[in-house]
Amino acid sequence: MRSLRERLRAGETLVGDGAWGTQLMARGLKPGESPDALSLSNPDALVEVADLYLDAGADLITTNSFGASPLNLERHGLDGRAEEINRAAVATLQRVVADRALVSASVGPTGRVLAPYG
């Protein structure tokens, strides 16, 4: 598979995946639970979602790691597990995606308002 850079330079239009949170809720994620923790506790759900988007023609699949910052994970009792969760999210997608698409990291906010604003 050509790299992202090569594909963009060639003017190729790329299609991304969709809403991971909605798909994970349909697979049992409860309100208030950390979707990022599923990278450890239920990687099969990630495989199912990625397969749906791949079958729909996505060229870019994002990791299940939007809220996997240390500060955000702390709120869910997952202190010190950010690296483990992020690595698991990437590894799971690399296995399922293989050479069918590109894997992109999803990086969200910390979940906290930091000084001087908060």
Q: What kind of region is each of these model predictions?
A:
Residues M1-G118:
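Domain-level signal for soluble alpha/beta catalytic cores
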